[in-house]
Amino acid sequence: MADSTRPLLSDFNSSESNLPPPRSLEETIERCIGDFGWAQFLQAALVSFAWFFDAQQTFITVFTDSQPMWHCDNSDRVDSVCNTSSSNLCTLPNQTWSWDLNPHVSIISEWGLQCAGSFLKGFPASSFFLGCLIGGLALSTLADSSLGRKNMLLLSCLIMSLSSMLTAFSTSIWVYAFLRFLNGCGRATIGTCALVLSTELVGKKWRGQVGAMGFFCFTLGFLSLPMLGYINEGNSWRNLYVWTSIPTLIYCCLVRSFVRESPRWLIVKGRKEEAVSILQSIASNAITMSFTNLCFEVENDQSKSNPDVYDALKILVRKSWSFRRLLAAMVVGFGIGMVYYGMPLALTNLNFNLYLGVVFNALSEFPAFLITFFFIDKINRRDALIGFTALSGISSALIAVLGQQLGSLQIVLELVSFFSACTAFNMTLIYTIEMFPTCVRNSAISMVRQALVFGGVFSPVMVAAGRENQFWSYGLFGLIIGLCGLFVFGLPETRGSVLCDTMDEEEYKTLAKRQFIG
C-alpha cells in the first residue's frame, strides 16, 4: 500500500540524476522551493495579515457596544434626586441626567438600551459568535473540497468587510445583530484558511514560525482598536465599522491579485500544472531544478468526479484514527477557548483597575507569540500543551482560592493564566496542522477552532455567576482547562514530522513509526 500511495518525483534532467529521489510530496516541494526566500516570506506575510482584520471584528464591540458614562444635571441643588455614584440610572427621570458624550458614541445610548436586559444588550455580541460557529461548520469544508484555500480566504474577507460596512447603516438593534451574525459567518474561516495556506507555502523547517506570524498579526489588530477608539472618541460608533471595513476591502484586492493557491491542495486535486507553476514562482533563486518535467503521483482520497463539499468531514469521521485525533483536539480546544475568551471578561470581578487589566491582557499575547515563534521547532507539542494548560488551570484556580483581598496577586495570577492559555491556543492550531493530511487539514483545523469559539460561548454566563462567588468563574475555568488538557495524552507527537497529503500516507507514516518504536 505504501508504494502505491506515496508521491513520487520522476523524469529528472540528467544533471540531477545523481540526486536521490524524494520519498514524499513534502520532500519534493522542499526540494523545489529551496530555502525560505523572499517570495515565500511575502506570500506568508500577506496571507497572515488577514488575522489583523479578524481581530478587529472580533473585539470591535468592546467600543461600539459599551455603556457610556453619564452625569447628573443640576446635581448641586438641594432637592436633586440624582447622584452619579449611588443612583440607578433607570430609576431617574430623563430630565435629571445626561450622557457625558454624544449619544451616538455607542449603540446603548443611541438606541436607548441603558435600561434593557442583559440579554438584549449582549444579543449582538452573541449573534456574532453564533455566526462564527455556523459559518465555521458551513464554510470550512469548502477550502478542502471545491474552493481551495485562497478563494475561501478571499470570500471570507469579502463577506466580513461588506457586512462590516453595512453594519454602519444599521437602523435598529435587530438589524445590527443580524449584520453582526453575518459578519461572524464570514469571519469564521479566515484564521484557519490563513494559517493553513501560509504554512503550506513553505517547508517544514519554517512551518512553526510562519504559523506564528498570524498570531502576531492578530495581536496587532487587537491593539489597533484602542487607537481607533481614542481617535473616534466623542463621535459615532458607526465610524469604527467604516474605518475597519475599507482596509479589509483593499486587502481583498491584494489577495485576489498576489496570493498564490496552495500547491499541496492543487496536487491533491489533480491540478499539477498549476501547482508546478506556483512552485516555480515561489522557489528560491538558488534553485536551478528544471520544473518542466516535474511529475507528481498522488492518490486522491476523494476520487469522485463531483465531490461533495462535506467529503473532507466524512473522511475525518470515517477513519477511526482521524476521528479520535479530531475529538481529542476539539476537547482540548474547548477548554482553552473557555479561558482565552473568558479571562478578559472576568476582569470586572477582580479588585483591580479594569482599564489596566485589559491593557495587560492584550500585551500578554506578545510573549505568547514570541514563545511560539522562536521555540515551536524546539519543544514537543504534547509536553508543551500539557504544561501550559496545567499552568493556566492552577493559576486560575488560585485566584478563586485567594479571594479579592489580594488584588495585586490576583492580577498576576490572572495574567499567568491568560498568557498560558494564549500560548496553548497558538500551539493547538499548529499542532492540528501537523496531525492531519492536506486533503482534510483545513476541515480539521476549522473544527478545532470552532471548539475554541464554542468554549467562549459559555464564558459570559460563568463570569456573571462569578460576581457573587469567584469559584463559578475562575475556579471552573481552572478545573475545565486542566481536565481538557489531559486529552492531549491521546494525541501523537508531531515535532519535526513530515506533512502528509493523503489519508493513506498518514496511516503509513503512523504505522512505520509504531514499528520503529516497537
Curated annotation (Swiss-Prot):
Its main location: membrane. Glycans are attached at residues 83, 94. PANTHER family: SOLUTE CARRIER FAMILY 22 MEMBER (PTHR24064). The gene is OCT3. This is Organic cation/carnitine transporter 3. The chain crosses the membrane at residues 33-53, 123-143, 158-178, 181-197, 211-231, 240-259, 326-346, 356-376, 384-404, 411-431, 444-464, 471-491. GO terms for molecular function: ATP binding; transmembrane transporter activity. CDD domains: MFS_OCT_plant (cd17378). High affinity carnitine transporter involved in the active cellular uptake of carnitine. Also transports organic cations. GO terms for cellular component: plant-type vacuole membrane. Belongs to the major facilitator (TC 2.A.1) superfamily. Organic cation transporter (TC 2.A.1.19) family. Residues 1-32, 144-157, 198-210, 260-325, 377-383, 432-443, 492-518 are cytoplasmic. The lineage of its organism: Eukaryota, Viridiplantae, Streptophyta, Embryophyta, Tracheophyta. It comes from Arabidopsis thaliana.
